[in-house]
Amino acid sequence: MDTALKRSRSDEPAELPPPAREVEEKEEEEERMEQGLEEEEEEVDPRIQGELEKLNQSTDDINRRETELEDARQKFRSVLVEATVKLDELAKKIGKAVEDSKPYWEARRVARQAQLEAQKATQDFQRATEVLRAAKETISLAEQRLLEDDKRQFDSAWQEMLNHATQRVMEAEQTKTRSELVHKETAARYNAAMGRMRQLEKKLKRAINKSKPYFELKAKYYVQLEQLKKTVDDLQAKLALAKGEYKAALKSLERISDEIHERRRSNAMGPRGCGVGAEGSIASVENLPVSKPEPDAISVASEAFEDDNCSNLVSEDDSETQSVSSFSSGPTSPSEMPDQFPAVARPGSLDLPSPVSLSEFGMMFPILGPRSECSGASSPECEVERGDRAEGAENKMSDKANNNRVLGSTNGGSGRSRSQSSTSLESQALETRMKQLSLQCSKGRDGIIADIKMIFIFYTFLQ
């Protein structure tokens, strides 16, 4: 038995000590982090790679253009310094002849410039002449074909073609006129410059021959410097273009970065839900009971008290019957009365143990009117109402007495004294009863008004 237990224990794998477990957990966490980083690197927006390549290319172009521009400027400066030094040495060597021959060389430069302008004006004039000749030939051919073909009609298309040809002829004539004027002006300037140059050449022939090496070297350096200046301008334009591409790539990367950050922020925040407390309020509204509210003890007691008073009034007086009938025509049960007020959740301590709700009180006593109309037993409206009811009762009693008298008069003379005594007794009983009813009515209304005040206080507190 012991040997079997030892064998089973030896077969079980030995548990690792706590430090070894912690090392393994750390290694697993590092592997997970590396996997997460690899996944993030895989999810990089492909546009970033393209924009980064453009950015690197623009950086290389900017560096290369800046180097080339610096070399060109350095070369321009070196050539300028070299020309200045050599021309100064040559001017000192030649001496005064350089200054004396300057007017001739200046006139020669102006004549050369006028010659170039005249040549350009001559080319423009020849081109305008050729265009005018071609337009005139087009019009002549169109007219000739129209005249040769007897069947051809002079339609709108033919008219439009002739109009275009005529317009080209007019434009060519205007261009020819302008180029002819320019050619005449440039030719006149060229002739004047050549005349002045020949005149100065005859006058300053010796100084011109002596200073000729100086001005030839100066012209050579001038052409070289012009070429270098053009190269510098081209490199500056290319550098500005490379900087523009670099700026555009930076803006694209910034836009992509903003989009990525916005997407991450929206993913972290999640979809927008309801506001704080919105779910609770919605749930409370949905869970509100749809059943009718329970009546309370005060409304039931007031209803019973009013029913008792009204039943007494109905049995004694017809006028009271009308008022009670108007009262009974309204809804008397909670199921018949509409809900004037929505159901509102309230604390359990304020619930009244009664089968009638406070919201139905206004429908149960329509005869009393609003609260402002009868606010107490001493109100003038209530006094007037009680007086009217008492007067109506007295009128009824007088009518009944008159009827009894008429009936007594129709009877024999023997029963007249008996009818009069019975009528007087009946009238006294009626008057006593009316006084009791008026007192009961006033007391009942005072109690009802007090109950109404209490109910309004409770209703206001609940709201």
Swiss-Prot record:
Any one biological process term the GO annotation gives: intracellular signal transduction
Keywords: Coiled coil, Cytoplasmic vesicle, Guanine-nucleotide releasing factor, Membrane, Mitochondrion, Phosphoprotein, SH3-binding
Residues found modified as Phosphoserine: S354, S378, S379, S421, S424
Main location as per UniProt: membrane
One GO CC annotation: cytoplasm
UniProt keyword Metal-binding present: no
Residue stretches of biased makeup (Low complexity): 323-335, 416-428
Biased composition (Basic and acidic residues): 1-12, 45-54, 383-399
Sufficient for interaction with RAB11A and for guanine nucleotide exchange activity: annotated segments: 33-268
Annotated localization: Cytoplasmic vesicle membrane; Mitochondrion
Disordered as annotated region, ranges: 1-69, 309-348, 372-429
InterPro entries associated with the record: SH3BP5 (IPR007940)
Record's signal peptide: none
Ranges of biased composition (kind: Acidic residues): 25-44, 309-320
Family: Belongs to the SH3BP5 family.
Oligomer status and interactors: Interacts with BTK. Interacts with all isoforms of MAPK8, MAPK9, MAPK10 and MAPK12. Interacts with GDP-bound and nucleotide-free forms of RAB11A.
The protein's name: SH3 domain-binding protein 5
